């Protein structure tokens, strides 16, 4: 028997191995692709930071996030959560900060009737800065659809949401007196209006392959002043007629962005009011608002006075006055405030005019006549007196996800 086993071994026979049958693979079902419309709806609800991350995760996602439909939908969603934008020069750099515009009902305010003070400062969110090497801007136009126009050594367009900026080639003529920013909602075009020292007006359209400047006819030579707003395709700004030495040389210039033509709206605005006045959106109508102060004490604010434009064709203004309570003037003596705009809830917003500590903003409700005072913390040290620059504060700022390439201009990442 042993011989047989040995022979079997020599002949190379192997013992039988038990083979286990492999289970059949179940067919793998591929997940259904998510419809583009659903992706766009989800992306539109993300924060601007999350949208930026999604651009980097997938080329397909990035292509979706560049679509015009998504940009417009995100703007629509962002309009429901407007922000207040702050910008100022800080040792040569222009800084941008923002904060939610709507008051937080959970915040703890003092229980004074009709006058509330926030006990804790609100931290503003840092957005971007304007490099010192590019020059400092003296003029900052109000944001339109999240974009900001600044005039420095060159005119620049900023998008604080994407932290991009773009140069715009200036006119060949030197000595630009002023720069304004407008938007045409029909053709969906941004335009820059420029006025030279010889009062010649020119306009340029963003997004074109070659930036060109066109001369615009202007029948009334004028000096543009400090306040402007773009509403329904019309750029409004306060102005003073050149050579007019009458007590009322002021008016509102109205530039129709799409048709590129001027109209001038005379109004009753005196010299003593011009420094504390502003053009605002009052319930969908253009209005000019200013502060009435006590003759004996210029720091004592008595009321807000508004002129509301009821008829553009016949230039008819109506007057509204909101009297301020006496406790409004129980503020620190060194606070110098200016009107910065009006919210959709009917609140006139004022802010400290210069960057200093503490920095305040105020909400005055034209509905309840209540006042809320907030202290804002920018997380920086107070600048020295000779570096205490003017603060530009804007209401109704919305975030814009459009990248520089969408405007057809080269960008500088911040």
UniProtKB/Swiss-Prot annotation:
Residues of the F-box domain: 28-77
Organism, as annotated: Arabidopsis thaliana
Spans annotated as Disordered: 1-24
Gene3D superfamilies, per the entry: 1.20.1280.50
SMART domains the UniProt entry points to: FBOX
Protein's name in the database: F-box protein At3g47030
PANTHER family: BNAA05G37150D PROTEIN-RELATED (PTHR31111), E3 UBIQUITIN-PROTEIN LIGASE SGIP1 (PTHR31111:SF94)
InterPro entries per UniProt: F-box-assoc_dom_typ3 (IPR013187), F-box-assoc_interact_dom (IPR017451), F-box-like_dom_sf (IPR036047), F-box_dom (IPR001810)
SUPFAM superfamilies registered for this protein in UniProt: F-box domain (SSF81383)
């Amino acid at each position: 028997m042993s011989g047989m086993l040995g022979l079997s071994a020599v002949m190379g026979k192997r013992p039988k191995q038990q083979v286990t049958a492999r289970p059949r693979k179940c067919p793998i079902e591929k997940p259904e692709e998510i419809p583009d419309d659903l992706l766009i709806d989800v992306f539109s609800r993300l924060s601007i930071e999350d949208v930026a991350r999604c651009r980097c995760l997938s080329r397909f996602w990035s292509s979706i996030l560049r679509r015009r439909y998504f940009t417009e939908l995100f703007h629509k969603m962002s309009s429901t959560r407007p922000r207040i934008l702050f910008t100022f020069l800080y040792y040569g750099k222009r800084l941008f900060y923002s904060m939610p515009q709507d008051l937080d009902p959970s915040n703890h305010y003092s229980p004074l009737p009709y006058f509330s003070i926030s006990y804790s400062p609100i931290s503003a969110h840092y957005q971007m800065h304007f490099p010192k090497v590019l020059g400092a801007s003296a003029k900052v136009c109000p944001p339109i659809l999240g974009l900001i126009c600044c005039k420095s050594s060159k005119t620049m367009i900023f998008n604080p949401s994407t932290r991009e900026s773009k140069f715009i080639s200036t006119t060949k003529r030197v000595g630009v007196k002023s720069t304004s920013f407008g938007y045409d909602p029909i053709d969906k075009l941004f335009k820059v209006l420029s006025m030279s020292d010889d009062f010649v007006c020119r306009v340029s359209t963003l997004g074109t392959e070659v930036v060109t400047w066109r001369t615009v006819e202007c029948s009334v030579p004028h000096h543009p002043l400090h306040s402007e707003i773009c509403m329904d395709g019309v750029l409004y700004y306060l102005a003073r007629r050149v050579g007019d030495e009458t007590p009322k040389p002021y008016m509102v210039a109205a530039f129709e962005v799409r048709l590129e033509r001027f109209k001038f709206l005379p109004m009753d605005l005196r010299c003593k009011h011009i420094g504390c006045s502003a053009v605002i959106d009052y319930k969908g109508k253009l209005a000019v608002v200013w502060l009435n102060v006590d003759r004996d004490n210029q720091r004592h604010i008595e009321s807000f006075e508004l002129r509301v434009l009821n008829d553009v064709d016949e230039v008819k203004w109506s007057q509204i006055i909101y009297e301020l309570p006496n406790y409004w003037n129980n503020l620190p003596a060194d606070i110098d405030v200016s009107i910065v705009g009006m919210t959709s809830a009917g609140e006139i917003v004022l802010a400290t005019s210069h960057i200093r500590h503490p920095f305040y903003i105020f909400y005055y409700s034209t509905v309840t006549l209540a006042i809320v005072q907030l202290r804002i913390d920018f997380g920086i040290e107070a600048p020295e007196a000779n570096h205490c620059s003017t603060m530009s504060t804007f209401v109704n700022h919305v975030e814009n996800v459009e990248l520089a390439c969408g405007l057809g201009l080269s960008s500088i990442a911040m």
